[in-house]
């Protein structure tokens, strides 16, 4: 039996290494990329960075996932999307709820239409806090939206409240 030459061993190692790197690049490219959510107009506000440190790891049993966009947080497959740095709403006749000391306005103009005209998402916005925090919840997650707002309350309360719902 003839031993392989050094050249054959080096060439075989290089080919094998290249194949391994190519397989790794292919596997990485097949991973889902984080959702790109448009940042709020004032997402760079220092209070947004402060509250982000206290976002819960899970909402509605969904893990917090990576998201592109400053001031943006996402749980699950975008079941819940949070954007900090919104312009505070003016006094409104839209439904306003106080959940554990945080006032939230259900923005009727911001809910999006799904198939068949049903509302596929609901958008809530903190009231009386600057910057405001917007939370968008899918229709499937809407039945537990109260739980979501309770879970987000600890983080959001770090933004001082300057006005209350009527």
Go through each PLM region and give its residues.
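Generic solvent-exposed, charged/amphipathic alpha-helical segments
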Residues: 52-57, 153, 157
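N-terminal signal-anchor transmembrane alpha helix of single-pass membrane proteins
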Residues: 16-24
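C-terminal region of N-terminal signal peptides and the immediate post-cleavage residues
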Residues: 7-9, 23-45
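N-terminal export and membrane-targeting signals
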Residues: 1-16
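Exposed, flexible binding/inhibitory loops of compact, secreted disulfide-stabilized domains
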Residues: 43-49, 162, 166
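Extracytosolic low-complexity repeat regions of secreted or lipid-anchored proteins
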Residues: 93-166
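Extracytoplasmic/periplasmic/luminal assembly and interaction segments
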Residues: 53-100
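Short, intrinsically disordered, charge-biased short linear motifs at domain edges
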Residues: 34-35, 68-73, 151-152
């Amino acid at each position: 039996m003839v031993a392989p030459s050094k050249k054959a061993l080096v060439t075989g190692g290089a080919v094998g290494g290249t194949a391994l790197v190519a397989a790794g690049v292919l596997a990485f490219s097949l991973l889902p990329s984080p959702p790109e959510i448009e940042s709020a107009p004032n997402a760079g506000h220092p209070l947004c960075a402060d509250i982000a440190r206290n976002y819960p790891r899970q909402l509605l049993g969904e893990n917090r996932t990576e998201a592109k966009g400053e001031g943006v947080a996402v749980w699950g497959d975008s079941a819940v999307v949070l954007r900090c740095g919104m312009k505070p709403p003016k006094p409104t006749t839209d439904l306003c709820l106080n959940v554990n000391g945080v006032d939230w306005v259900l923005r009727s103009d911001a809910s999006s239409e799904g198939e068949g005209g049903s509302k596929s998402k609901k958008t809530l916005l903190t009231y009386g806090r600057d910057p405001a925090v917007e939370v968008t919840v899918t229709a499937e997650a809407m039945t537990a939206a109260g739980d979501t707002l309770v879970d987000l309350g600890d983080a959001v309360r770090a933004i001082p409240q300057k006005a209350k719902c009527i």
